[in-house]
Amino acid sequence: MIIEIITIFPSFFKSFCETSIIKRALEQKKVQIKIHDLRIYSSNKHNQVDDSVYGGGVGMLLSFPPFFDCLQKIKTPQSKVILLSPQGQIFNQIHATNFAQKETHLIILCGNYEGVDARILQYIDAEISIGDYVLTGGEIAATVLVDAITRLIPGVIKEQSYLEDSHQQGLLKYPQYTRPQNYFNHVVPTILLSGNHAKIRSWRQKESLKKTLQKRPDLLENKKLTLEQTKLLKEIKQELQK
């Protein structure tokens, strides 16, 4: 997987690429991350890449030519071009999984100021937002996408690790505990110490459903449940009504 990021703040990504899973994925060559400074593609002697908005308006807009010229240089037939924008689809685990499994070359455009010249949109394959709020620039959102996608690339982390993550199976993750077993009467559920893997699996399934029902019931609306999950969910609802 090659991920290329077009930004006016290339130094923003330095520490990100030198930390944790991203650093390991780069060292193991599971992913390549290339940062492109948009200002290099400016024809202005001051390397300016923004300008005032035609028709009037507050703020500055990132110009079309630098984005266009950069894309002309790095885009290939295999590229998937993503614009980070508050107007885009809300990014979720399904997007992350699809990008990790189906794409080999992602180009991420980071917007700033009032956004980008609308002419760039005809070269975009997807507009993505990380939430219904506005950030100063797309750089923070870019790190969210890169992190979420990279950890799903085969070989970056153990498959079992992400298969049990919240949202990967359409449910929130069950509660987890570690040592000590008892601390000032705050105890770990005894079933987790039983060694009975079937009961532990069932407990985790039930707790996952319970947490999802209580915190994110919207996730259950379109979730296709197994017969076991349907039975457990019915039990949970009955217990909560008592």
Curated annotation (Swiss-Prot):
Keywords of this entry: Cytoplasm, Methyltransferase, S-adenosyl-L-methionine, Transferase, tRNA processing
Catalytic activity line of the entry: guanosine(37) in tRNA + S-adenosyl-L-methionine = N(1)-methylguanosine(37) in tRNA + S-adenosyl-L-homocysteine + H(+)
GO biological process: tRNA N1-guanine methylation
Main enzyme class: transferase
GO cellular component, one term: cytosol
Major subcellular site: cytoplasm
Entry's localization field: Cytoplasm
EC number(s) stated in the UniProt entry for this protein: 2.1.1.228
CDD domains: TrmD-like
Source organism superkingdom: Bacteria
HAMAP family xrefs: TrmD
Record's subunit section: Homodimer.
Function: Specifically methylates guanosine-37 in various tRNAs.
NCBIfam families: PRK00026.1 (NF000648), trmD (TIGR00088)
Protein name (record): tRNA (guanine-N(1)-)-methyltransferase
Organism of origin: Aster yellows witches'-broom phytoplasma (strain AYWB)
